[in-house]
Amino acid sequence: MAQNTRTGDLTSGPMLQKIILFSLPLAASSILQLLFNAADVVVVGRFAGSTALAAVGSNGALINLLVNLFVGLSLGANVVAARCFGAKDDEGVHNTVQTSVTLGLVSGFLLAVVGFFAARVLLELMSCPEDVIGLSTLYLKIYFIGMPMTMLYNFSSALLRAVGDTRRPLFCLAVAGLINVVLNLVFVILFSMSVAGVALATIISQTVSACMVTALLVKEKGPLHLDLGHLGFHAGALGQILRIGLPAGLQSTVFSLSNVVIQSAVNSFGSIVVAGNSAASNLEGFVYTAMNAFAQAAVTFTSQNMGARRYDNLDRVMRNCLLCAIVTGLVLGGGASLLGEQLLHFYSSDEVVVTAGLARMHIICTTYLLCGCMDVLASCLRGRGYSVLPMVVSLVGSCLLRLVWIATIFRLFHTTTMLYLSYPVSWILTTLVHLACLLVVRHKMKNRPKLSIA
């Protein structure tokens, strides 16, 4: 039976309860996505050795660098669809759906070509260790072959989030996650395929999740219905998606560029530190995605309320999302830091790898709530229609600062501790500037109650 699209009203009722109910399936979905990579890392680390573990883990920053621009565009699709839905503009919702899915497929094919043919060169630019680069290149090439399906899932699930539906994408990912884990074990243990096996398992599972979520849109009877026979770009919808999504994507891309520079600095310490950093980064990802669910809630709730002209709800959305992100960061980040040694042993039995991972986790996990606050405030600005502003603030406050830190402080004190401290320092400064910008925007909106959302 088709889903009634008019069930995702995020503009009325108990806001905190709605935010939590919206965010929990979203957090679970993001965690399942992380489990794809975690399953790769754990199986490879346990059954293929530390070199294979470093090969898989060292690709994360580079993958994010190439992918995040287009993931930002899916955020634009989410904002535009949510605004149209809040304004009860059915034609606008439908045009956004057709445009978004088309954009997702085109983006995926572009990424597949670039990622496949440039893999080795990009890894060499990152100073990937010689004993790792061959396996890293193989993993990266196979991974990017599946990029059209990854982008299709991102854009399709963004459209479902726009109308408050976060539960059905969770089910799709749960099915795909089980497939991924089973295939990892089969390919690596039974067929001894090492990194090629985990990459192949990942793209098969991502294809399953993409097809399932897209099928949900096809079965819709309301404005969210996807007509596969009439895919294409609608100029108005595409323009709005690009206006919101490009700044967000550029911000994420430059963030990833700074992380690539940091990964290159990590690579300078050798494959043991690379392996420990990879395992720690994967664990930290679970904390981040749990917090980031509330940032995604902030942009969707803010966008719908802007579309419905319920400006009185905007402050409540911001306060509730900040509260949830802070509590999540404190509980999960603190817990991960305290249990870091035990958790890292899931990834590697090598004590020196575990020690290297702990050095990162004790700094990042204990301060991760700052990152959660930064993301929620940026999402509130985007939902209000200001996408360039948080991009500029983040690029200067986080990315540029990290690059300067590595070129100065890290060069003087060449230790992993000094390298990892660049994260919390950048989060503090960026959060403070985002807050100041949001207060200014809030004041402008109060003085212009008839503010246009176009």
Task: Give a label for each model feature.
Residues 12, 16-35, 39, 62-69, ...:
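Residue-level signal for short hydrophobic patches within transmembrane helices
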Residues 53-113, 150-169, 263, 276-340, ...:
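Small-residue-rich hydrophobic transmembrane alpha-helices
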